[in-house]
UniProtKB/Swiss-Prot annotation:
Coiled coil residues, start to end: none
Organism: Glaesserella parasuis serovar 5 (strain SH0165)
Name of the gene: rpmA
GO molecular function, one term: structural constituent of ribosome
Region (Disordered): 1-20
Keyword Transmembrane helix included in the entry's annotation: no
Protein name as it appears in the record: Large ribosomal subunit protein bL27
Top-rank lineage group of the source organism: Bacteria
GO process terms (BP): translation
Keywords from the UniProt entry: Ribonucleoprotein, Ribosomal protein
Gene Ontology CC annotations of this record: cytosolic large ribosomal subunit
Family to which this protein belongs: Belongs to the bacterial ribosomal protein bL27 family.
One Pfam family from the record: Ribosomal_L27
Length: 85
């Protein structure tokens, strides 16, 4: 004979894996061409000079230099640029 009444099943108990998004290289850091600067969903940050954008909106350096974050334009967009050294 069971000493405890059977518990019902739950519909919870699952969660998606973290995607490791965010800024990978901060302002003033030196980077090499091809380095990932930001992983993002959508264009939270836009590509400035010497920065390319992948099909998943990842920003990467296209030249060696230092990372620079700036806000500009009428819409106050955030841009990431690489200042060549």
């Amino acid at each position: 004979m069971a000493t405890k009444k059977a518990g019902g099943s739950t519909r919870n108990g699952r969660d998606s894996e973290a995607k490791r998004l965010g800024v990978k290289r901060f302002g003033g850091e030196s980077v090499l061409a091809g380095s990932i600067i930001v992983r993002q969903r959508g264009t939270k940050f836009h590509a400035g000079s010497n920065v390319g954008m992948g099909k998943d909106h990842t920003l990467f350096a296209t030249a060696d230099g230092k990372v620079k974050f700036e806000v500009k334009g009428e819409k106050n967009r955030k841009y990431v640029s690489i200042i060549a050294e």
